[in-house]
Structure formats: structure tokens, C-alpha cells
Swiss-Prot record:
<dbReference type="InterPro" id="IPR001383">
    <property type="entry name" value="Ribosomal_bL28_bact-type"/>
</dbReference>
<dbReference type="InterPro" id="IPR026569">
    <property type="entry name" value="Ribosomal_bL28"/>
</dbReference>
<dbReference type="GO" id="GO:0005840">
    <property type="term" value="C:ribosome"/>
</dbReference>
<dbReference type="GO" id="GO:0003735">
    <property type="term" value="F:structural constituent of ribosome"/>
</dbReference>
<protein>
    <recommendedName>
        <fullName>Large ribosomal subunit protein bL28</fullName>
    </recommendedName>
</protein>
<dbReference type="InterPro" id="IPR037147">
    <property type="entry name" value="Ribosomal_bL28_sf"/>
</dbReference>
<comment type="similarity">
    <text>Belongs to the bacterial ribosomal protein bL28 family.</text>
</comment>
<keyword id="KW-0689">Ribosomal protein</keyword>
<dbReference type="GO" id="GO:0006412">
    <property type="term" value="P:translation"/>
</dbReference>
<dbReference type="Pfam" id="PF00830">
    <property type="entry name" value="Ribosomal_L28"/>
</dbReference>
<dbReference type="InterPro" id="IPR034704">
    <property type="entry name" value="Ribosomal_bL28/bL31-like_sf"/>
</dbReference>
<keyword id="KW-0687">Ribonucleoprotein</keyword>
<dbReference type="GO" id="GO:1990904">
    <property type="term" value="C:ribonucleoprotein complex"/>
</dbReference>
Length: 78
């Protein structure tokens, strides 16, 4: 499975690692993904989902339903 947040679609970012002597090399900045088991109140069931910590913080603030609706994700597929 790819390293993509199933809720927000966040994926890796291409960046540069810069040394002290200013030699630049490419590096991949991965998303901080966590496997979580979340209670979906509206569907009355647990869902297992791989989400980023930023999405988890948003869920704690506004709720799972609102975050899923904002990102156009159908929670019935989980």
C-alpha cells in the first residue's frame, strides 16, 4: 500500500537536503502516517484507516464526518 493519507490524500514531498558546505541532494519528506481505529458515530461502527497526524488533529477538532465531507471521502468504503 502506498504512503498516502486515506482521508486527505496527503503524500510525500520532494525536498532538498542542504549540507554545511551547501551541497544539495534530493530527499523525500514522507507524511507522518498512523494506522488508527476510529469510531464513526453516524455509521455506528469502527473504521480502520491510515491517516496523517494532521488529519487526526483535524478530526479531534471538528469531527470525523466533517473532515470526510470536506475532502470528499465516503466512509462506507472502510
Amino acid at each position: 500500500m502506498s504512503r498516502v493519507c486515506e482521508l486527505t490524500g496527503a503524500r510525500a514531498n520532494n525536498g532538498m537536503a542542504v549540507s554545511h558546505s551547501h551541497i544539495r541532494t534530493k530527499k523525500l519528506q514522507q507524511v507522518n502516517l498512523q494506522k488508527r481505529r476510529l469510531w464513526w458515530q453516524e455509521g455506528k461502527k469502527w473504521i480502520n484507516i491510515k491517516i496523517s497526524t494532521k488529519a487526526l488533529k483535524s478530526i479531534q477538532k471538528v469531527g470525523l464526518d466533517k473532515v470526510a465531507k470536506t475532502n470528499g471521502v465516503d466512509l462506507n468504503k472502510f
